[in-house]
């Protein structure tokens, strides 16, 4: 009997140990941050944090999703805006081009541009209760003008989106609000089981384009037309093929060391922001709730995409890696000429670094 009890105790201990090590790995507890960053960087202060940055390469402008997300974490009633930078004129200045005029609420998240159309995810004040929406805008020389609001029950927890035509787009749901799974499945979801979806809007209706993804926090399209999606909980970028009916076919994935967020695309280059340490990010959010500030590491990586390679990557390079004391919680990196623009989940600034020095 004693031997049986000992075996059972040993099994429980081993299972607990394996689970603890697995969770420590998922939370990046053992990750060591060896800083690598350009020698010349400067901050441009904002009224809130720019969680997403979308560059209009045709017109030389950057659009920023601005919201006081620190205030939001602390329970404040905040409203956001879309900012614009004229990249052709130095020094760069932030111009507010939309502050929610005509809307009851404006809390922007992911952005996308195609031609003269800009779209933004808009979160309600009561997330998980009130409907999420997509706001569409027309771009002109005068700025941007709000066109319409798109709503669908399929937009459960939208995080990012990508236009593939001026009236067609894909929207990625993360895991924050998912009413289609039970409590046990939510635990499995946190452990990495894929329950997220990508939604397709065809100009009139929305439908599910892809299922069983591990929390989609970034979406973009390559020059060949492949949809690439950040699967944050799986530390990978999923590569998907567009089908004629708007559905997406899973082809493969790009493995990453960090948990990916927003993705920018310029030619063959994919620039992906990553959470280098999930445990540090959690501590950062907890500190903000307490009115303190504890930085979280920031990571931006460049991937040269090649569709006919087995791992889809011809070259990798760390563009920016820091402990977060310069800019914390980096959520997006976008390149204009020889400059890297970095946005953050919570820091009220963007960080601009000179590349190639």
Model-derived regions, located:
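Beta-rich, blade/repeat-based domains predominating
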Residues: 47-56, 100-115, 152-168, 192-197, ...
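Asp-box/WD-like beta-propeller blade repeats and closely related beta-sheet repeat scaffolds
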Residues: 97-164, 172, 176-177, 183-185
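Blade-loop segments of beta-propeller domains
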Residues: 50, 68-71, 75-115, 119-124, ...
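Beta-propeller blade signature
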Residues: 79-88, 131-140, 188-203, 292-309
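Beta-strand-rich domains and repeat architectures in extracellular enzymes and scaffolds
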Residues: 42-80, 327-332, 346
């Amino acid at each position: 009997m004693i031997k049986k009890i000992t075996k059972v105790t040993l099994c429980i201990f081993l299972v607990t140990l394996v689970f603890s090590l697995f969770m420590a790995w998922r939370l990046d507890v053992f990750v060591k941050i060896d800083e690598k960053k350009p020698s010349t960087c400067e901050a441009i202060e904002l009224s809130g944090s720019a969680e997403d940055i979308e560059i209009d390469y045709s017109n030389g402008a950057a659009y920023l999703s601005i919201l006081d997300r620190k205030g939001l974490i602390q329970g404040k009633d905040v409203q956001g805006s879309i900012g614009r930078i004229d990249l052709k004129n130095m020094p760069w200045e932030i111009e507010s081009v939309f502050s929610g005029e005509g809307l009851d609420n404006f809390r922007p998240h992911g952005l996308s541009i195609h031609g003269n159309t800009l779209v933004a995810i808009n979160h309600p004040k009561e997330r998980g209760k009130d409907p999420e929406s997509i706001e569409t805008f027309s771009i002109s020389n005068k700025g941007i003008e709000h066109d319409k609001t798109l709503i669908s029950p399929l937009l459960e927890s939208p995080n990012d989106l990508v236009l593939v035509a001026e009236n067609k787009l894909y929207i990625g749901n993360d895991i924050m609000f998912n009413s289609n799974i039970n409590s046990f499945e939510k635990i499995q979801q946190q452990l990495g089981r894929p329950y997220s979806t990508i939604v397709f809007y065809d100009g009139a209706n929305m439908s599910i384009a892809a299922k069983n993804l591990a929390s989609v926090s970034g979406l973009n399209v390559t020059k060949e037309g492949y949809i690439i999606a950040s699967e944050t909980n799986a530390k990978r970028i999923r590569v998907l093929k567009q089908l004629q009916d708007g559905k997406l076919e899973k082809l493969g994935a790009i493995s990453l060391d960090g948990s990916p967020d927003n993705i920018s695309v310029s030619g063959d280059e994919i620039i992906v922001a990553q959470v280098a340490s999930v445990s540090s990010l959690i501590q950062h959010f907890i500190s903000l709730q307490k009115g303190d500030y504890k930085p979280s590491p920031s990571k931006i990586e460049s991937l040269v995409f090649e569709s006919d390679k087995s791992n889809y990557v011809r070259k990798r390079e760390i563009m920016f890696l820091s402990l977060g004391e310069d800019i914390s919680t980096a959520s997006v990196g976008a390149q204009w000429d020889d400059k890297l623009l970095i946005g953050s989940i919570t820091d009220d600034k963007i960080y601009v670094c000179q590349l190639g020095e």
